[in-house]
Amino acid sequence: GGCIVEGTTIATRYQWKNTVGPVENRPINISRWNYTFPHKKFPDYYQSYGLGFFEYFQLSEDIGAEPLPVLNCGLSCQFENEGMDQHVPVDKLQPYIDDALDLIEFANGPITSQWGKVRADMGHPASFNLKFIAIGNEQWGPLYPERLEPFVKAIRAKYPEIKIIGSSGPDSEGKDFEYLWPEMKRLKVDLVDEHFYRSPEWFLNSAKRYDSYDRQGPKVFAGEYACHPTNRENSFLTALCEAAFMTGLERNADVVELCTYAPLFAHVDAW
């Protein structure tokens, strides 16, 4: 998931079908983050796809976790693209919708299906029992729900048992956040992904954030949260503030169905 699925351009978005099959045949792809480290002399942060969706599904199975793939909704990174040339028109979305449907088939389909056979040929004839799929990452504005809607309709029609996750955008409050939550309710997504990269004070003051959330609407997926002081370093203070926030997540488990610390798998120097 994350901004990787968007790509700096629509051509460099994460395409899951390039990440399955024989490892030696998988293409490389430029990473959304390849230029965001000023100390690096070269834009050398590429994706080899040696670790793809099949391997992620295997990892989830091995550690007893539920896989939650995030797919592109037809929008490249909106921070990087204010115009429309790197966004897919709504009437051209069918290949992207097919990618979502095919991924569910790859994860859960019988070995007699096209993508179930690919999974079986890779050594896993049994279903991965995928339960969740997220469409879009930190998208915002009307561009997002108008693209999300046909995905929701198609997935509901073919795989009604799959829980669909929409996004509340990159902010934890404000104009875009307030716009997207009613849209997610209108589209009847199952969960809404909220992201928080905020100060220690914010985390301490937000322990009761979900006490007053609507219990009749979509559930919450706190998909990215991390306490960021000025220097963004981890410390006892940041851990304490995150723990305070987590008491609110646990207390409101009837509405906060899922949560994930970011980064759940830490990296070192962009590797």
Whereabouts are the PLM-identified features?
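Catalytic-core region of carbohydrate-active enzymes that cleave or remodel glycosidic bonds
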Residues: 58-59, 153-156, 160-163, 181-186, ...
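N-terminal catalytic cores of secreted or lumenal carbohydrate-active enzymes
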Residues: 1-162, 166-180, 186-187, 204
